[in-house]
């Protein structure tokens, strides 16, 4: 427990501002710094997950257009699927490979299309999405887990493309797709 004289010495060492004008100036300066930091901070900056989602969606839309142009669906002049949205989660961990997990929500189009043709188209779209994620310009190597859904029901997942599991490791992706775009010299150990 402190005695009165020790407490008095400590309180004497603490600087005091007793000038009202000085206190007002410090208060205004504090408000100014707070306002400046709020204005300078980017408020609507998107994260890596959003950039990956945009990249995958763009690749899927381009793939659908190419498939229709090449006539891969016979006499049908519309794509079998329409991309509603792409939900991506990029999980980075210390000492572990980054995991890119995505779900593309699709709507079925072109009712006259045969189911086997629609399923094959979905596999092609998932393969395009996996390649887009693997060839990203930001990080490598990555683990990829992806699937396509329609009405909360899985249409196709990584196993339908012949991968060994739902989460595909970088070594297996390298075997099929080569080196990632971010690090073209990368090879599995």
Identify the meaning behind each predicted range.
Residues 35-55:
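Transmembrane-cytosolic junction motif
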Residues 60, 112-138:
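Short, non-transmembrane amphipathic alpha-helical segments
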């Amino acid at each position: 427990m402190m005695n009165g004289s020790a407490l008095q010495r400590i309180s004497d060492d603490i600087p005091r501002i007793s000038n009202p004008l000085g206190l007002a100036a410090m208060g205004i300066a504090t408000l100014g710094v707070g306002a400046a930091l709020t204005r300078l901070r980017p408020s609507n900056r998107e994260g890596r997950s959003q950039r990956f989602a945009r990249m995958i969606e763009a690749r899927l839309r381009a793939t659908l257009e190419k498939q229709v142009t090449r006539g891969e669906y016979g006499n049908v002049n519309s794509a079998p699927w329409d991309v509603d949205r792409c939900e991506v989660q990029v999980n980075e961990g210390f000492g572990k490979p980054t995991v890119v997990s995505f779900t593309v929500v699709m709507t079925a189009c072109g009712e006259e299309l045969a189911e086997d043709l629609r399923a094959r188209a979905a596999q092609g779209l998932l393969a395009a999405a996996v390649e887009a994620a693997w060839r990203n310009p930001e990080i490598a190597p990555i683990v990829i887990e992806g699937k396509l859904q329609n009405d909360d029901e899985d249409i196709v997942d990584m196993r339908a493309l012949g991968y060994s599991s739902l989460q595909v490791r970088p070594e297996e992706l390298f075997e099929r797709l080569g080196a990632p775009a971010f690090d073209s010299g990368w090879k599995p150990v």
